[in-house]
A protein has these predicted regions:
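Non-catalytic DNA-recognition/assembly elements of restriction-modification systems
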Residues: 9, 13, 18, 61-86
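A generic structural signal for residues embedded in beta-strands
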Residues: 140-141
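Sequence-specific dsDNA recognition surfaces
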Residues: 57-62, 77-92, 106-135, 153-154, ...
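Short, intrinsically disordered, charge-balanced linker/junction segments flanking boundaries
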Residues: 72, 166-168
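Extended, domain-scale alpha-helical bundle/helix-rich regions
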Residues: 2-63
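Short, Lys/Arg- and Gly-enriched loop/turn segments at beta-strand edges
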Residues: 147-153
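Glycine- and aromatic-enriched periplasmic loops at the membrane-periplasm interface
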Residues: 161-165
Length: 168
Protein backbone atom coordinates (compact mmCIF):
# COMPACT_ATOMS: atom_id res chain seq x y z
CA UNK A 1 0.00 0.00 0.00
CA UNK A 2 1.45 3.37 -0.99
CA UNK A 3 1.04 6.64 0.94
CA UNK A 4 -1.94 7.84 -1.14
CA UNK A 5 -3.78 4.54 -0.67
CA UNK A 6 -3.15 4.73 3.09
CA UNK A 7 -4.45 8.31 3.21
CA UNK A 8 -7.57 7.34 1.25
CA UNK A 9 -8.16 4.35 3.52
CA UNK A 10 -7.87 6.48 6.68
CA UNK A 11 -10.24 9.11 5.25
CA UNK A 12 -12.77 6.42 4.32
CA UNK A 13 -12.67 4.98 7.85
CA UNK A 14 -13.10 8.47 9.32
CA UNK A 15 -16.12 9.23 7.12
CA UNK A 16 -17.71 5.94 8.18
CA UNK A 17 -17.11 6.65 11.88
CA UNK A 18 -14.78 3.70 12.29
CA UNK A 19 -11.60 5.58 13.13
CA UNK A 20 -12.30 6.58 16.74
CA UNK A 21 -14.55 5.42 19.55
CA UNK A 22 -17.93 7.13 19.78
CA UNK A 23 -18.50 8.61 23.25
CA UNK A 24 -21.95 9.31 24.68
CA UNK A 25 -20.74 12.50 26.41
CA UNK A 26 -19.94 14.02 23.00
CA UNK A 27 -23.66 14.03 22.18
CA UNK A 28 -25.43 12.87 19.08
CA UNK A 29 -25.72 14.26 15.60
CA UNK A 30 -29.44 14.83 16.25
CA UNK A 31 -28.59 17.12 19.20
CA UNK A 32 -26.07 19.04 17.09
CA UNK A 33 -28.57 19.38 14.24
CA UNK A 34 -31.16 20.78 16.65
CA UNK A 35 -28.61 23.34 17.86
CA UNK A 36 -27.78 24.28 14.26
CA UNK A 37 -31.50 24.65 13.47
CA UNK A 38 -32.03 26.96 16.46
CA UNK A 39 -29.05 29.12 15.46
CA UNK A 40 -30.18 29.18 11.82
CA UNK A 41 -33.71 30.20 12.87
CA UNK A 42 -32.22 33.05 14.91
CA UNK A 43 -30.12 34.21 11.94
CA UNK A 44 -33.26 34.22 9.78
CA UNK A 45 -35.16 36.15 12.45
CA UNK A 46 -32.30 38.68 12.66
CA UNK A 47 -32.40 38.94 8.82
CA UNK A 48 -28.75 37.89 8.55
CA UNK A 49 -29.65 35.00 6.24
CA UNK A 50 -32.68 34.15 4.13
CA UNK A 51 -34.95 31.22 4.81
CA UNK A 52 -34.11 28.37 2.46
CA UNK A 53 -36.44 25.89 0.81
CA UNK A 54 -36.80 22.63 2.74
CA UNK A 55 -34.68 19.85 1.29
CA UNK A 56 -36.06 16.35 0.67
CA UNK A 57 -35.45 13.67 3.29
CA UNK A 58 -32.58 11.29 2.55
CA UNK A 59 -33.91 8.00 1.22
CA UNK A 60 -32.53 4.52 1.94
CA UNK A 61 -31.18 4.16 -1.62
CA UNK A 62 -29.04 7.30 -1.13
CA UNK A 63 -27.21 5.88 1.90
CA UNK A 64 -23.87 4.43 0.71
CA UNK A 65 -22.78 2.77 4.00
CA UNK A 66 -23.67 2.39 7.66
CA UNK A 67 -22.61 5.02 10.16
CA UNK A 68 -22.52 4.96 13.96
CA UNK A 69 -25.90 5.08 15.70
CA UNK A 70 -25.20 8.53 17.18
CA UNK A 71 -24.57 9.98 13.69
CA UNK A 72 -27.17 11.21 11.23
CA UNK A 73 -27.30 11.40 7.43
CA UNK A 74 -28.21 14.87 6.20
CA UNK A 75 -27.91 17.14 3.20
CA UNK A 76 -25.15 19.74 3.14
CA UNK A 77 -27.77 22.45 2.64
CA UNK A 78 -29.25 21.61 6.05
CA UNK A 79 -26.14 22.63 8.00
CA UNK A 80 -26.19 26.26 6.97
CA UNK A 81 -26.94 28.94 4.46
CA UNK A 82 -24.89 28.69 1.23
CA UNK A 83 -24.06 31.55 -1.11
CA UNK A 84 -21.49 32.47 -3.73
CA UNK A 85 -19.41 35.61 -3.69
CA UNK A 86 -18.93 38.25 -6.36
CA UNK A 87 -16.22 40.27 -8.05
CA UNK A 88 -16.95 44.00 -8.17
CA UNK A 89 -16.24 45.57 -11.54
CA UNK A 90 -12.63 46.71 -11.90
CA UNK A 91 -14.07 49.57 -13.97
CA UNK A 92 -15.03 51.06 -10.60
CA UNK A 93 -11.73 51.42 -8.73
CA UNK A 94 -13.65 53.10 -5.90
CA UNK A 95 -15.09 49.65 -5.07
CA UNK A 96 -11.58 48.58 -4.04
CA UNK A 97 -10.97 51.51 -1.71
CA UNK A 98 -11.67 50.23 1.76
CA UNK A 99 -10.75 47.85 4.53
CA UNK A 100 -13.22 44.99 4.05
CA UNK A 101 -11.27 41.79 3.28
CA UNK A 102 -12.09 40.34 -0.17
CA UNK A 103 -10.96 36.74 -0.55
CA UNK A 104 -10.16 34.91 -3.77
CA UNK A 105 -9.95 31.12 -3.99
CA UNK A 106 -6.16 31.33 -4.11
CA UNK A 107 -6.33 32.65 -0.53
CA UNK A 108 -7.93 29.41 0.70
CA UNK A 109 -5.44 27.29 2.64
CA UNK A 110 -7.44 24.30 3.95
CA UNK A 111 -7.23 25.94 7.36
CA UNK A 112 -8.23 29.08 9.20
CA UNK A 113 -8.30 32.34 7.24
CA UNK A 114 -6.86 35.18 9.31
CA UNK A 115 -5.22 37.40 6.71
CA UNK A 116 -6.40 38.41 3.24
CA UNK A 117 -4.26 40.63 1.00
CA UNK A 118 -7.02 42.37 -0.99
CA UNK A 119 -9.81 44.66 0.17
CA UNK A 120 -13.04 46.28 -0.97
CA UNK A 121 -14.97 49.21 0.44
CA UNK A 122 -18.44 49.75 1.83
CA UNK A 123 -19.52 51.09 -1.58
CA UNK A 124 -18.83 47.67 -3.13
CA UNK A 125 -21.06 46.03 -0.51
CA UNK A 126 -23.84 48.52 -1.20
CA UNK A 127 -23.69 48.58 -5.02
CA UNK A 128 -22.83 44.95 -5.89
CA UNK A 129 -23.97 41.47 -4.91
CA UNK A 130 -21.08 41.05 -2.46
CA UNK A 131 -22.00 39.62 0.94
CA UNK A 132 -20.07 40.00 4.16
CA UNK A 133 -19.53 36.53 5.61
CA UNK A 134 -19.28 36.27 9.39
CA UNK A 135 -16.51 34.69 11.44
CA UNK A 136 -16.88 30.91 11.37
CA UNK A 137 -18.12 30.73 7.78
CA UNK A 138 -16.81 27.71 5.88
CA UNK A 139 -15.49 28.66 2.44
CA UNK A 140 -14.97 26.39 -0.56
CA UNK A 141 -13.47 26.93 -4.00
CA UNK A 142 -16.10 25.84 -6.53
CA UNK A 143 -14.06 25.58 -9.72
CA UNK A 144 -10.73 26.24 -11.39
CA UNK A 145 -7.25 25.26 -10.25
CA UNK A 146 -8.21 25.52 -6.58
CA UNK A 147 -11.45 23.49 -6.74
CA UNK A 148 -12.19 21.87 -3.40
CA UNK A 149 -9.86 24.07 -1.36
CA UNK A 150 -11.42 25.04 1.96
CA UNK A 151 -11.07 27.64 4.66
CA UNK A 152 -12.78 28.78 7.85
CA UNK A 153 -13.02 32.52 8.42
CA UNK A 154 -11.48 33.88 11.60
CA UNK A 155 -12.37 37.37 10.36
CA UNK A 156 -15.39 38.83 8.55
CA UNK A 157 -14.76 38.80 4.80
CA UNK A 158 -16.29 38.88 1.34
CA UNK A 159 -15.35 36.46 -1.46
CA UNK A 160 -15.16 36.37 -5.22
CA UNK A 161 -17.64 34.41 -7.34
CA UNK A 162 -15.47 31.27 -7.53
CA UNK A 163 -15.91 30.80 -3.80
CA UNK A 164 -19.00 29.73 -1.91
CA UNK A 165 -19.61 30.30 1.77
CA UNK A 166 -21.58 28.23 4.23
CA UNK A 167 -22.78 30.15 7.25
CA UNK A 168 -23.46 27.37 9.76
Amino acid sequence: MNAQDLKNSILQLAVQGKLVEQRAEEGTARELLEQIKLEKDQLIKDKKIKKSKPLPEITEDEIPFEIPESWEWMRVGDVGSWSAGATPSRQHPEYYEGEIPWLKTGDLNDGYITDIPEFVGQLALEKTSLRLNPIGSVLMAMYGATIGKLGILKIEATTNQACCACIP
